[in-house]
Amino acid sequence: MSDTLPLLLRAARGEAVERPPVWMMRQAGRYMKIYRDLRDKYPSFRERSENPDLSYEISMQPFNAFKPDGVILFSDILTPLPGMGIDFDIIESKGPQIGDPIRTMAQVDALHPLNPAESMPFVGEVLGRLRQSVGNEAAVLGFVGAPWTLAAYVVEGKSSKNYAVIKAMAFQEPALLHKLLDHFAESIAQYLRYQIDSGAQVVQMFDSWAGQLSPADYDTFAAPYQKKVVDLVKQTHPDTPFILYISGSAGVLERMATTGVDIISLDWTVDMAEALARLPEHIGVQGNVDPGLLFGTPEAIEARIDDCVRKARGRKHILNLGHGILPGTPEENGASFFRSGKSVMDRIGALA
């Protein structure tokens, strides 16, 4: 019977559920003391995310503490890069650093096709262990970065405020950028298939930096490659719910709905009711509480959750933040978010 399946999986498939499932982007991370203690012991981010024992332990920390309805693999969107021949590191307080930023056609031509089982066996191992550990108490989520966002990192060489280098490439050498984006789309689709085969029940694609594009450029450099990833994954795994997240997506919501995804993860800068009015009925939503609210009071967190769920009522909805939980968030407020999310129907009533 399907009601023995995890709540989040049932909701993501569009089944009627007793309450919206709840999880948090970046729910495993720096706001938790247990994570900071582990980070002090293992300071290398790549070790924490690529050692299967550490990645598994970190992925399980929020589940053990708060029992969210989703457990997401502890990893990074850049994790597949070395398997394509691109070296990177993540430096504490500085963020990602790309060893040799990609600026030429020769560099793109030299990239390897991704074989995830070969280059990232730790990912498959962790996903399998997570499925075994959480059973039907939570859905296991896999994730990837979208082609535009991966390209932004590897072309810029690091995080950027204005994306001048990749935008220069887009407007001066579009053929070069399109070839890179196409390579990433093929590779990311393979990576998602591997994650699903290894145990991921729901997947999310982060196009974090696509919100930096004008709608016309989104149509040219982001949406076609998002759609290619979705199409390739749906060819082999049509029943796996697919979520798309873009930070700063209010200007392209309708466009996101044309990519073939099942659920759009909203940031907090768009009102939930307005977003739903703009999206087709068959598209579900995830979000969209402001992570900054988690620096407030438990009462404020509860009130905002109630408002969000009330507005999303009647539509496929997964309760989440509008972005990852912020470092420095009081851990008890993270607990508050989960507690209030799970008890929301007690306050707003099943039919209110």
UniProtKB/Swiss-Prot annotation:
Coiled-coil spans in chain: none
Assigned EC number: 4.1.1.37
Protein name: Uroporphyrinogen decarboxylase
Function: Catalyzes the decarboxylation of four acetate groups of uroporphyrinogen-III to yield coproporphyrinogen-III.
Gene Ontology biological process: protoporphyrinogen IX biosynthetic process
SUPFAM superfamilies, sorted: UROD/MetE-like
Disulphide bridges: none
Any Gene Ontology CC annotation: cytoplasm
Highest taxon of the lineage: Bacteria
Record-linked PROSITE patterns: UROD_1, UROD_2
Keyword DNA damage among record annotations: no
Site, as annotated: Transition state stabilizer: D76
Family statement drawn from the similarity comment of this UniProt entry: Belongs to the uroporphyrinogen decarboxylase family.
Compartments, as annotated in UniProt: Cytoplasm
Catalysed reaction equations from the record: uroporphyrinogen III + 4 H(+) = coproporphyrinogen III + 4 CO2
Subunit structure and binding partners: Homodimer.
Molecular functions (GO terms): uroporphyrinogen decarboxylase activity
Binding annotation for substrate: R26, Q27, A28, G29, R30, D76, Y153, S208, H323
Gene: hemE
Keywords, sorted A to Z: Cytoplasm, Decarboxylase, Lyase, Porphyrin biosynthesis
Name of one Pfam family that matches: URO-D
Keyword Secreted on entry: no
Pathway(s) of this molecule: Porphyrin-containing compound metabolism; protoporphyrin-IX biosynthesis; coproporphyrinogen-III from 5-aminolevulinate: step 4/4
HAMAP family: URO_D (MF_00218)
Organism: Synechococcus sp. (strain WH7803)
